[in-house]
UniProtKB/Swiss-Prot annotation:
GO terms for cellular component: extracellular space. This is Prolactin-7D1. Keywords: Disulfide bond, Hormone, Secreted, Signal. SUPFAM superfamilies: 4-helical cytokines (SSF47266).
Length: 244
């Protein structure tokens, strides 16, 4: 099930409510981690950069998804797929559950959010970025191999791949200051749809592209929400829960 707190239609609204409320607070609450002022200052700088990247990635995910639906390269097939999927709720649920990052347990309720630690949220972001690292590389490779693929789509895929790497570096640096025991090589979900993405059968390949862009968009918006929420927790701690 798509976590109710981070649905594409609601995460932006939640984030705006959350951040607008913070401007009313003059006194910064205690941070959720034990660290020196110097380390907290470094973390703030890292999160400032991370939130910019996550926001850019989220927007690119939305734009690329729209390009697939609007460009003649893929629009006919994509619109047919979405019509078929919406013939039943079961089809939609099955499609979402096929996203390879579903095993990453993002909190589904406000109560779950409150029970989740700062470090656990960090690990979610780390695992999600790692889970997309190789798939994004393959996406760029396969789109580049399609002569009819427009640059408008390919360029978005290339930008997302590059920014995913950059954001991953920032998250790893943040983790090194919060808890070095969290390792980059921890288990994370693996993607197993490369054969479909490389398929010579257009219908199979385009369905793989449809699902790829669908799952990617959801996850990029999730990452953006989580990175901003982590920054809020670092700066304001419990105040961040006040708008949920």
């Amino acid at each position: 099930m798509l976590p109710s707190l981070i649905q594409p239609c609601s995460s932006g609204t939640l984030l705006m409510l959350l951040m607008s409320n913070l401007f009313l607070w003059e006194k910064v609450s205690s941070a959720p981690i034990n660290a020196s002022e110097a380390v907290l200052s470094d973390l703030k700088d890292l999160f400032d950069n991370a939130t910019v990247l996550s926001g850019e990635m989220s927007k690119l995910g939305v734009i690329m998804r729209k390009e697939f639906f609007m460009n003649s390269f893929s629009s006919e097939t994509f619109n047919k797929i979405i019509l078929d999927l919406h013939k039943s709720t079961e089809n939609i649920t099955k499609a979402f559950n096929s996203c390879h990052t579903v095993p990453i347990n993002v909190p589904e309720t406000v109560e779950d959010v409150r029970k989740t630690s700062f470090e656990e949220f960090l690990k979610m972001v780390l695992h999600m970025l790692l889970a997309w690292k190789e798939p994004l590389k393959h996406l760029v490779t396969e789109l580049s191999a399609l002569p009819e693929c427009p640059y408008r789509i390919l360029s978005k895929a290339e930008a997302i791949e590059a920014k995913n790497k950059d954001l991953l570096e920032y998250i790893i640096r943040i983790i090194s200051k919060v808890n070095p025991a969290i390792k980059e090589n921890e288990d994370y979900p693996t993607w197993s749809d490369l054969d479909s993405l490389k398929s010579a059968d257009k219908e199979t390949q385009f369905f793989a592209l449809y699902m790829f862009s669908f799952c990617l968009r959801i996850d990029l918006e999730t990452v953006d929400f989580l990175v901003n929420f982590l920054k809020c927790l670092l700066l304001y701690d419990d105040v961040c829960y006040s708008e949920f």
